[in-house]
């Protein structure tokens, strides 16, 4: 079978492949994002206003045992969505007088549903991509050139070993990362970050597309909410989708969606007194939440989206590893700058989120204290779909 690098050199006289070591970038901890909201800009406001209807100046709210118990019979959350990606370093390639990293990735976005006590897969999106420097296309032919390359790659795969054909593997897309941006001294490390970012952007684009599909199919309503694993604060500067079709982030799609982050920056916003909220978060008692605070997020389209953010402690655990163990960050999209979420709705959502934390995945995931069990199952479902890394790397 003719490998991708061989085809790339054959089709591009201006490219030289060095055939350096191939490896999984994800195995390098320096490439792993520590917080779900690591790229979120801390609020510059001296104080942050409440984004719930109850405006009492109390720092925390207790979720009553009665509410937690009464919501167990009919869960509010029906759908659970997670995105995952593996990134690979394929080679160092010479274009002109500069060396660039060439990467690949496998992207999986999955949604599971729970209906009548049965948990099953609802939707799955999966693709293999190449992440290459923008000048891989020396003639700037754009999509026709990239499609021609993909056709040649995939034809070679189809003519390869039968075992590979049985898996139905194909390379679906070539992503092109920026190589300039007004900086002439960019190094390999920066290019590598851009390579990974392009794959990450593709994954988050398809998370949003899947949310849109659920809305268009009429599956999300007042009685059937979606938990999205991670933040729902999407910046359109970090998207691979053309500007004229970025309607995937229509705000109406998120009316019945809650973003739940297991890891977060506790200093993202200040409280109503202008003090760091991290102290209040760390001191939350079992089944207690912070007030809902308004957070303005620049969308990258010249406007802002406004989110209601609160933090919730999920468990009665006297032996937690850190003060932030078993606390999750919860996000909902607000209706404009002055929008608020009804306090009773926040408490109802919080009670349901607490119930989703049981049973636990203790012993199976080091993040068990901050995990919601249906989200854990959805994550496991997505990751079970990954092809073996050696198979992916051997394509190239």
Predicted regions and their residues:
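Long, contiguous domain-sized segments
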Residues: 1-49, 53-54, 59-72, 90-93, ...
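Short acidic, Gly/Ser-rich segments with clustered Asp/Glu that frequently serve as metal-coordination loops
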Residues: 83-89
């Amino acid at each position: 079978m003719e490998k991708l690098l061989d085809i790339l050199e054959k089709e591009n006289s201006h490219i030289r492949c060095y055939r350096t070591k191939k490896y999984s970038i994800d195995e390098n901890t320096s490439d792993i994002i520590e917080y779900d909201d690591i790229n979120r800009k801390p609020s510059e406001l001296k104080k942050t206003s409440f984004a719930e209807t109850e405006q009492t100046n109390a720092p925390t709210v207790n979720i009553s045992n009665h509410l937690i118990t009464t919501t167990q019979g009919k869960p509010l959350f029906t759908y659970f969505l997670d995105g995952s990606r593996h990134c690979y370093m394929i080679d160092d390639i010479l274009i002109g007088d500069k060396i660039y990293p060439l990467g690949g990735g496998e992207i999986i976005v999955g949604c599971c549903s729970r209906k009548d006590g049965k948990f099953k897969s609802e939707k799955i999106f999966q693709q293999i991509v190449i992440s290459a420097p923008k000048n891989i296309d020396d003639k700037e032919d754009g999509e026709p050139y990239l499609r021609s390359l993909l056709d040649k790659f995939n034809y070679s795969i189809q003519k390869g070993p039968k075992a590979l054909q049985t898996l139905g593997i194909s390379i679906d897309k070539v992503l092109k990362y920026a190589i300039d941006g007004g900086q002439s001294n960019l190094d390999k490390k920066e290019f590598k970050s851009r390579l990974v970012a392009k794959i990450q952007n593709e994954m988050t684009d398809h998370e949003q597309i899947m949310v849109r599909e659920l809305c268009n199919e009429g599956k999300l309503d007042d009685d059937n909410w979606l938990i999205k694993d991670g933040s729902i604060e999407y910046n359109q500067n970090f998207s691979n989708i053309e500007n004229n079709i970025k309607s995937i982030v229509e705000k109406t799609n998120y009316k019945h969606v809650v973003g739940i982050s297991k890891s977060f920056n506790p200093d993202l916003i200040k409280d109503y007194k202008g003090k760091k909220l991290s102290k209040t978060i760390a001191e939350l008692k079992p089944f207690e939440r912070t007030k809902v605070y308004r957070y303005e997020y620049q969308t990258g389209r010249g406007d802002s989206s406004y989110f209601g953010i609160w933090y919730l402690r999920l468990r009665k655990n006297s032996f937690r590893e850190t003060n932030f163990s078993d606390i999750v960050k919860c996000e909902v999209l607000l209706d404009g700058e002055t929008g608020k979420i009804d306090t009773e709705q926040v408490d109802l959502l919080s009670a349901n989120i607490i119930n989703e934390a049981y049973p636990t995945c203790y012993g199976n995931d080091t993040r068990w204290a901050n995990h919601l069990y249906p989200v854990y199952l959805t994550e496991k479902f997505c990751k079970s779909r990954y092809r073996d890394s050696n198979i992916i790397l051997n394509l190239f």
